[in-house]
Each structure stands twice: as C-alpha cells, then as structure tokens.
Amino acid sequence: MDSNTITSFQDILQRMSKMQLESSSVDLNGMITQFERLKIYRDSLGESVMRMGDLHSLQSRNATWREELSQKFEEIRWLIAECRNILTKTENSFERITFLQALQLLLEVESEIRTFSFQLI
C-alpha cells in the first residue's frame, strides 16, 4: 500500500473517532471498525499479489477466499452508502470533508482490491 493511502486511512479513522454524529455513535464505531478491517484485508491481498507465488497458499489456506472477497465488496458498498447517507444529512463542514475523503478512499480501495483479485484469479 502506498504511503498516501496509509496516511489517508489513518487520517480518516482518526477524524471519525473524534466525531459525534446525530445518528448513533454505534453506527460510527461500526464504520470505523469496518474501515480498519478493510485496510487490513487490502494490505494482505496486496502482499499476496506482490509475492504472486502465494496464490496457491492463499487458496489452500483459505478455500473460501472468493467468498471473503465478495463479502469485502459488500462491506465496501455498505460503507459507500453510509458515507453518501451522512453527506446528504450533515451540514457540518468537518464531517462533509471527512466523509467525502472517506468516499474517495473507498472507491480507490475498491478499485485496488478488484485489480488484486483479478491478478490472483
């Protein structure tokens, strides 16, 4: 993962952790947790692609990796929908900037995970 993406994840997570949205903090904490898991998944998938010989070990270690991949795309779509939902409701500029950047990052990560997964297939 390039340093800009790492910084973006860290920055967004840090800013989200300081927010109190009008919706429940449980929803925001859930989003933060999913962002963190998505970052870890994206990193591990990227490392597997870099080692390229890991395709067989990845498949043998986890025969359901395609199902996991599908689940991650579902999580990304949910996070995108949540970011868009928050953007339509909030007028707070700090929140708008944070969730616009989160949305952009999610779209970039989705594209990267698709690229990695096609390389592994």
UniProtKB/Swiss-Prot annotation:
Q: Which UniProt keywords apply?
A: Host nucleus, Host-virus interaction, Transport, Virion
Q: Name one GO cellular component term.
A: virion component
Its main localization is virion
- Kindly list the places in or outside the cell where this protein is found, as annotated in its UniProt entry: Virion; Host nucleus
The membrane-spanning stretches of this chain are: none
Q: Where is this motif: Nuclear export signal?
A: 12-21, 85-94
User: Additional info?
Assistant: Average number present in a viral particle is estimated to be 130-200 molecules.
Indicate the quaternary assembly. Interacts with protein M1. May interact with host nucleoporin RAB/HRB and exportin XPO1/CRM1.
What the entry lists under HAMAP family is as follows: INFV_NEP (MF_04067)
Name of this protein: Nuclear export protein
Q: Which organism is it from?
A: Influenza A virus (strain A/Mallard/Alberta/827/1978 H8N4)
